[in-house]
Structures are given as structure tokens and as C-alpha cells.
Amino acid sequence: MATIALPWSLSLYVFLLLLATPWASAAVKNCSHLECFYNSRANVSCMWSHEEALNVTTCHVHAKSNLRHWNKTCELTLVRQASWACNLILGSFPESQSLTSVDLLDINVVCWEEKGWRRVKTCDFHPFDNLRLVAPHSLQVLHIDTQRCNISWKVSQVSHYIEPYLEFEARRRLLGHSWEDASVLSLKQRQQWLFLEMLIPSTSYEVQVRVKAQRNNTGTWSPWSQPLTFRTRPADPMKEILPMSWLRYLLLVLGCFSGFFSCVYILVKCRYLGPWLKTVLKCHIPDPSEFFSQLSSQHGGDLQKWLSSPVPLSFFSPSGPAPEISPLEVLDGDSKAVQLLLLQKDSAPLPSPSGHSQASCFTNQGYFFFHLPNALEIESCQVYFTYDPCVEEEVEEDGSRLPEGSPHPPLLPLAGEQDDYCAFPPRDDLLLFSPSLSTPNTAYGGSRAPEERSPLSLHEGLPSLASRDLMGLQRPLERMPEGDGEGLSANSSGEQASVPEGNLHGQDQDRGQGPILTLNTDAYLSLQELQAQDSVHLI
């Protein structure tokens, strides 16, 4: 019996639950007479209207968030017949962000009846799905003309979540006309200014603006703003008197041309005006003579001469024909043998006994000194040669010459002095120079202390090439056999002791048969003189 009673009681419980469920869902979802809007910041405005007659004196709206621990309440006030409204203040400041898009509010309408408070309406509210912003404010005229006007406005209490989705509408009307006849202008972007055109001059207008957040197509337009009244400017009276504007431009152009030609005529005819203009337009340039008194007195106050080049222009142009430069001979490194210092047999004609000598033949081979790996190493002799071509003159005066068949004795330097000479390639007109003749080798002089020799002067004559004593002094060691080294040293020292220095010059003067090379001192030029003669062919 107990087992039959349990299923009967369970079925009765389920039946009662099914009956109660539709009533509860209807109480939650029935929001037809209650409208609430969120201004995206800290305010929820609600309006409640009912059809049935309720004997109530006071009603309130209660709001509770599912994510926040607060309850807000506002009292409904009668706005019009059977309509009540109130504002739920959610934050302490109007610009505070009180809700987000995930908040859900439970809103209830409770009224006081004779027996107590009774819940009349219950509704779930999603704030960001029911947005209605505050109406724009601070409308002002930025620029006004006869037919145009520029107007701006501001918006407030707008959340940063919906700022990119704002759009506006504006309407205008003639003062005294109805708003239903006004034209509406749509601004689909966040543009807080409006440029009105094609207005009537000297006419009064009124403008209103509203805003909406176009987010998920659920936004609602805000209320219209307070109307802005303005009046356009009257028409220009000059345009009515002179409607042809091109005539004014023509008169302006003619006036400019006449003024220009008048100024030119005055400047040409007035000869005293030029100095006056120079005085007026002159910039203050300081006098350099006040700061450089020495230079000013040296050049007589001539600034152009002071600033000019100290070298005349004629210095940079060649004054005569370009000299002929003889070819440069380059030898291989293997030719650095003793043959470079040998004189050929027919090197120079014999001098005359009268003391006159022929013109020396010089080349420019000693002017170039190369220090390359395989080149001939030459000590830098401070001797410069002219670039004149070689000219040989035969002495026509009476004098004896060597017979054609007589051989020239070779002039060889000592082994210790070979590096002191400026070595040149063998030529018919070769002339040897040495800055300083070094001391003879100890192999020639034994243990005798070396004596310094002074360099040959340009005005002194060279020793005779045919002097056999001098040839004996300059005979190289490498020409002697290997076993005669000691004998050569003894003979050399003996000859040096037996032959005095003055005897060498005496023998050269007594003999007139040895060839003598007399230096041509006119052929030697310093580097500055060479550059002064021909500055174009500088090396």
C-alpha cells in the first residue's frame, strides 16, 4: 500500500511544478511596460507605464548586478498620464564607468498598496544592448556668412567602448516653422561640426542635433539637443551696385601698371635720386683699414691690391720656348757592374794647350733618382743639370792632340770609394760627381789613419785621365790575382808616399797630352732658378 502511495505523491509534485513554471518565466520575461536605457557611463533611465488601473501611491525601481555587490533604487515620478520615470545613479560621478558589456542587471518595480509592498514587474536588463546617450550640448556658430554657416557641438558621458561607433543627425528649420517640416542631415561618422549652405541672407534659423551609438544595431537615438538660433548676414550692398566684378579687377590692374611706369620714369629722369638711394639702401660694411692698419698703409689703402695675389699672372705662363729634354735611360739591375764607371775610348776630344776647353756635354740622367727593388741605388747628389741638348765644339786653336790610335786609360774608383760616386749608365758624354770622396780603404794604406778629402769645387779642374799615378791609386782589388793581395797593398802605400799631392797637379800642367774635362759652370742651375725659368715643366 505504501508503494502505491509514493508514486501518486510524486506525480502530484511534478504536476504542481509544471503549473508553477510558466508563471515564473512570464514574470521574468514580461518587460513590455518597462523601458530602461543605459547612457554608457553611470546612469540607467527607466520609464514604466501600465494599462490596468492600480490603486498605488508610490512605486520604486530596484536594480541589482550579477557581478557587483550593490543595490540601487530610484523613485518613479509621474511624467504624464499613466507614465512614470526615474534615473538609477550607479556611480558617484557622472563620468565614471560603472558597467561593462558582461554585466546583467535584475530590475524590479515594486509599489506600495494598502497591505504593503508588492512586486509589480521583474525584468533582466543588458546595459550595452540598450544604449541611449545623453543629448549633445554646447552648440555654437563658428562662422556665418550670407548663405553659409558653420556649427559645432559637444557630447558628454560617452564610454570609450563606443566612441568609434558614434553617428549624428542634425535638423534645421526657419524660425517659426514646425520641426516636422525640417530637413534632416545625417553624419555617419564621428563629426562634431556641420557646414550649412544655400541659406537665405538676413534670415533666422534653428538647428538641433542628436547622437546614437551604432553598435550591434541595438542603439537608440538620444533626445534632440536644445535648439540653436542664428541669423545669416545681409547681402553685400556693393554687389548690388556693381554686379560686374570683373570691372573692379580691371581697374586694379590698370592702377598697378600706371604706378609701376610712374616709378620707372622718376628713377630715370631724376639723376640725383641714384646716390640718395645708394645711401639709403647701403648696408653698413666695416672699414678693414681700421683693423689692419699695417696692411692698409703698406698698399696705400688699396683694398683690391691688398687682396690680390702676390705673384703676377705672368709668373704662371712660360716666357720662352719649352726646353728639349733628353731621353731617360733606365738600366736593368744586372748592369750595376764596374762597366758603368768606364770611359769609352772616344769619349771626349783632347784639350788645347792654351787652356781653353770645349763645351761640356751634360744630360739629365742624374736628375732622376729611383729607389726601386731592382733599380740602381744612387746616392742623392745635390747637383742639377740643364735640359739643353748636348753640343760638342771642336777647339780650333793650336794645340796637340793624342793620336787617333792612342787608347784611353780606364778611370776606376777605389773599392772603398765606389759607393760614393753617383753611378750613371755609360755614355760618350758621361761626367762623374761625388759629394765627398771617402777615405781610402785600409787595404791600400795599411795602418795609416785615413784623411778626409774635401769635395771637388766646380771651378777646379778634374785630374788628368792619363795620369798613371792616379790610375795606380784607383786600380781595383778585384782585378789582381788572388795571391798578390799583400804586394798590391805595399805598392799602393809606397806610391802614395813617394808621390806628393802637388806633383800630381804639376805633372798635369807639364803634360799637355792627357784629356782634361773642364766643368761648364753656366750649366749648373739651382732648383729655384730652374723653376723660375720654366714653371710649367716642374718635376
Curated annotation (Swiss-Prot):
Residues 269-539 are cytoplasmic. One of its GO terms (cellular component) is external side of plasma membrane. Residues 27-240 are extracellular. Residues 395-419, 440-465, 477-516 are annotated as: Disordered. It comes from the Eukaryota. Glycans are attached at residues 30, 43, 55, 71, 150, 216. A motif (Box 1 motif) lies at residues 281-289. Its main location: membrane. GO terms for biological process: cytokine-mediated signaling pathway; interleukin-15-mediated signaling pathway; interleukin-2-mediated signaling pathway; negative regulation of apoptotic process; positive regulation of phagocytosis. Residues 1-26 form the signal peptide. It is a single-pass type I membrane protein. Residues 135-235 form the Fibronectin type-III domain. The chain crosses the membrane at residues 241-268. It is found in: Cell membrane; Cell surface. Keywords: Cell membrane, Disulfide bond, Glycoprotein, Membrane, Receptor, Signal, Transmembrane, Transmembrane helix. PROSITE patterns: FN3 (PS50853), HEMATOPO_REC_S_F1 (PS01355). Disulfide bonds join 36-46, 74-86. A motif (WSXWS motif) lies at residues 221-225. GO terms for molecular function: coreceptor activity; interleukin-15 receptor activity; interleukin-2 binding; interleukin-2 receptor activity. Belongs to the type I cytokine receptor family. Type 4 subfamily. Non-covalent dimer of an alpha and a beta subunit. IL2R exists in 3 different forms: a high affinity dimer, an intermediate affinity monomer (beta subunit), and a low affinity monomer (alpha subunit). The high and intermediate affinity forms also associate with a gamma subunit. Interacts with SHB upon interleukin stimulation. The WSXWS motif appears to be necessary for proper protein folding and thereby efficient intracellular transport and cell-surface receptor binding. The box 1 motif is required for JAK interaction and/or activation. Receptor for interleukin-2. This beta subunit is involved in receptor mediated endocytosis and transduces the mitogenic signals of IL2. Probably in association with IL15RA, involved in the stimulation of neutrophil phagocytosis by IL15. This is Interleukin-2 receptor subunit beta. It comes from Mus musculus (Mouse). The lineage of its organism: Eukaryota, Metazoa, Chordata, Craniata, Vertebrata.
